[in-house]
Curated annotation (Swiss-Prot):
Residues 171-190 have a biased composition (Polar residues). It comes from Homo sapiens (Human). The gene is TOM1. This is Target of Myb1 membrane trafficking protein. The lineage of its organism: Eukaryota, Metazoa, Chordata, Craniata, Vertebrata. Residues 321-326 are annotated as: Clathrin box. It comes from the Eukaryota. One of its GO terms (biological process) is autophagosome-lysosome fusion. The GAT domain and the VHS domain are required for the interaction with polyubiquitinated proteins.
Amino acid sequence: MDFLLGNPFSSPVGQRIEKATDGSLQSEDWALNMEICDIINETEEGPKDALRAVKKRIVGNKNFHEVMLALTVLETCVKNCGHRFHVLVASQDFVESVLVRTILPKNNPPTIVHDKVLNLIQSWADAFRSSPDLTGVVTIYEDLRRKGLEFPMTDLDMLSPIHTPQRTVFNSETQSGQDSVGTDSSQQEDSGQHAAPLPAPPILSGDTPIAPTPEQIGKLRSELEMVSGNVRVMSEMLTELVPTQAEPADLELLQELNRTCRAMQQRVLELIPQIANEQLTEELLIVNDNLNNVFLRHERFERFRTGQTTKAPSEAEPAADLIDMGPDPAATGNLSSQLAGMNLGSSSVRAGLQSLEASGRLEDEFDMFALTRGSSLADQRKEVKYEAPQATDGLAGALDARQQSTGAIPVTQACLMEDIEQWLSTDVGNDAEEPKGVTSEEFDKFLEERAKAADRLPNLSSPSAEGPPGPPSGPAPRKKTQEKDDDMLFAL
């Protein structure tokens, strides 16, 4: 039959296929391949002539480089041509006599040719499975699988390229049916019957991957670049902004970016299972990971910001304490009441708190007492006149003047000794009874008695050089002590 039809390469499309599959070519001539597709779509005999030329180049050819170029031309035509060409290519006769015959063991094809043929059969079987008039390749595919032939799984993403051209094929097929109306009305009915089941493949597009065209790939990558730009801007804003100090305009922009990226992620998640291009799928997964990371950062940002704002009203009362880092004078006084409110009713805790409070007050009182004591001693040293004991007249006159100015009552030496003994016994008793601490009143009394003892003791040894102790030596220390007591009471 082929002999009667003449040389397959003599037709316009055959000549171009011969050039496109020449073994001298280093790689595919895509411009020539697309020209072949245009001739097939535009001429009436284009599909048949092209298929005859491809069959001539593949069958029995030992130059497997030319065979690979012919398979590439065939694949390109299936992706870009219409239903008329698909009917011829998917026929059981062409698949079995051309493709399956090429990979027979007796021909000893290289692995690259073997895998290429199996990929074409598998992709066409999956693409044309829903079309009743294109099931010849499906039958061959199922027979090969039942015989145990393993199809390569790494190139399964090549299954989908046929779906995208089929969406445009419907219009071309409808147009071809309209062109044939004038020739035969029965052909119009047949074309209408064939056009009815053709919309079935788009229904399967949601279940099977889609191979985008180069224009769609470029548009998708530009949109992915836009998504990546939004992610970068949002990430930089989250890095620069402080949650508690962010401006309302910045927060509004951040929320807008978040909403935009959320919408973009939904589209990315829809495209991931639908795209058959492995490289595009990888890019979509990377973009999705970046979106998830920036969403996590935004959630932490919002959680910290809203957490600070919700805690602000409850912390409004101690705001002054947070600002004033100095010591709180009321902290010691309120410590016992705070611990009492916490039901810490231990006696040791209360005793410790009382000692802390008493020690604070005693320290202040002791400082005041030391100041008044120093000033009173200095004044007394300036006013007292020291004279020899022989000058009884001068001493008696000084004592009389001292008594008149202060109104003090002189006491005897025996009374002084009794007071000292009483103070010592009281001190020992208090130490034995109250080991936990002393109060402010006891400490004042202690200081007063010690002051009295310090003033009295030096005067006991002063008259030993001149005779027995007499009344003149006692009243002077007593008067000084009385004045110091008055000064201390005035200071307190």
